[in-house]
Amino acid sequence: MGKKLKYTKFQLRSNVVKPNICMSLTTDIAGEAKLKDLERQKKGDARTVVAIILGGGAGTRLFPLTKRRAKPAVPMGGAYRLIDVPMSNCINSGINKVYILTQFNSASLNRHIARAYNFGNGVTFESGYVEVLAATQTPGELGKRWFQGTAHAVRQFHWLFEDARSKDIEDVLILSGDHLYRMDYLHFVQSHRQSGADITISSLPIDDSRASDFGLMKIDDTGRVMSFSEKPKGDDLKAMAVDTTVLGLSPEEAKEKPYIASIGKVYVFKKDILLNLLRWRFPTANDFGSEIIPASTKEFCVKAYLFNDYWEDIGTIRSFFRANLALTEHPPRFSFYDATKPIYTSRRNLPPSAIDNSKIVDSIVSHGIFLTNCFVEHSVVGIRSRIGTNVHLKDTVMLGADYYETDAEIRSQLAEGKVPLGIGENTRIKDCIIDKNARIGKNVVIANSEGVQEADRSSEGFYMASGITVISKNSTIPDGTVI
């Protein structure tokens, strides 16, 4: 692909001057530009999209894991944090303009973002950016309040979309920071643009057994959202049944899954529409899902986008526990081991795991751990974990540690009757979440044999949530304890 530019001889005052350059070979710049434009139109231009990841509220349903951290900073899958999921989806989709809104317990989240997604040591973003926007107060009565909801949080930073850096932005992705799923956001945006929608909502087809647990949408034969119903039951539920073949399901699948649920806080807005809704149409609305979007169906074109794949809201201790253990299934419904669409996280430069005479069954074992003559069954073991001799770990999610203790420190603590990091010998643990830097002594039994569902035993270093024992971060469980 190229043109020859020929320089003809020319005459100046009867003197014939030969040019120094007789021929130049160049690329067909105009042709290449057209090809690039066609490719962007075909796939959707990621350069005109900005993503906003919501840091979430106080995370009370995930307490005590959110006692000292924001929901998106909660560790997941042995080596990741929940924020890595939407961040990686953005990277894999080619979207490199990202804002992250934070408010509660944001120190560890901010630190992780700085380490994992900066321009020097982590994932690079070329001409894009990743910026953490902490809750702040601004002049005016409304600006004196902290974030009151998803829409209020975005409204506080509406000026970003009027900034010169955002002049080419056409669409805004609104994303949650505490979901587990893998999505091509660019395909989502492309569908939004091709449909002519003002707002597009990511939706999940579901069957009768789960429909009452979700907010459902009623759509017409073009996929336009006509109405919403929050967790309907009985006749109200039956009234929300729709023909899901409209969104692309086969007739067989549509018969099994006749309901459309919003997966929550995964939206795409036209930028101008978003600004209009936040500043002028609904200036006091605090939430997208319960206020702005339902009200917008009457005036704007709101459409549903089919996402027929694994998705989990990590909003409770039970869902967090279940989603982690589901990673150990064969095959898992969600896997971090996808070479074409990897999940990124911070670089830790940890050594390989050291496993001595241990048995590991249906489990995930992260890097930098030490296992000695133990049995790990259907569990997730996080980074830098240390598990001692004759320990049996079953149905347990161990988040790992932030640092190592040296052999000398461990010997010194044992000599003084203290408990080192990790799990001591002859301990049995079942149905448990062990937060970071926990110290569990020798001959401990954690099994909730009495079936306690809820209990605050923070003075003893643990909680009971939905029947699951949660060992608090930095806590110590003494030798011989039975829970």
Curated annotation (Swiss-Prot):
InterPro entries, per database record: ADP-Glc_PPase, ADP_Glu_pyroP_CS, NTP_transferase_dom, Nucleotide-diphossugar_trans, Trimer_LpxA-like_sf
Catalysed conversion reaction: alpha-D-glucose 1-phosphate + ATP + H(+) = ADP-alpha-D-glucose + diphosphate
Principal location listed in the UniProt entry: plastid
Pathway terms, separated by semicolons: Glycan biosynthesis; starch biosynthesis
Activity regulation, per record: Activated by 3'phosphoglycerate, inhibited by orthophosphate. Allosteric regulation.
PROSITE patterns the record matches: ADP_GLC_PYROPHOSPH_1 (PS00808), ADP_GLC_PYROPHOSPH_2 (PS00809)
Domain of life: Eukaryota
Reported tissue expression: Tubers.
Entry's Gene Ontology BP terms: glycogen biosynthetic process; starch biosynthetic process
Cited Gene3D superfamilies: Hexapeptide repeat proteins, Spore Coat Polysaccharide Biosynthesis Protein SpsA, Chain A
Subcellular location: Plastid, Chloroplast; Plastid, Amyloplast
Keywords: Allosteric enzyme, Amyloplast, ATP-binding, Chloroplast, Nucleotide-binding, Nucleotidyltransferase, Plastid, Starch biosynthesis, Transferase, Transit peptide
Its EC number(s): 2.7.7.27
Any one GO molecular-function label of the UniProt entry: glucose-1-phosphate adenylyltransferase activity
Chloroplast listed as a keyword: yes
Family note: Belongs to the bacterial/plant glucose-1-phosphate adenylyltransferase family.
Subunit structure: Heterotetramer.
Function: This protein plays a role in synthesis of starch. It catalyzes the synthesis of the activated glycosyl donor, ADP-glucose from Glc-1-P and ATP.
Name of the protein this chain belongs to: Glucose-1-phosphate adenylyltransferase large subunit 3, chloroplastic/amyloplastic
Source organism per UniProt: Solanum tuberosum
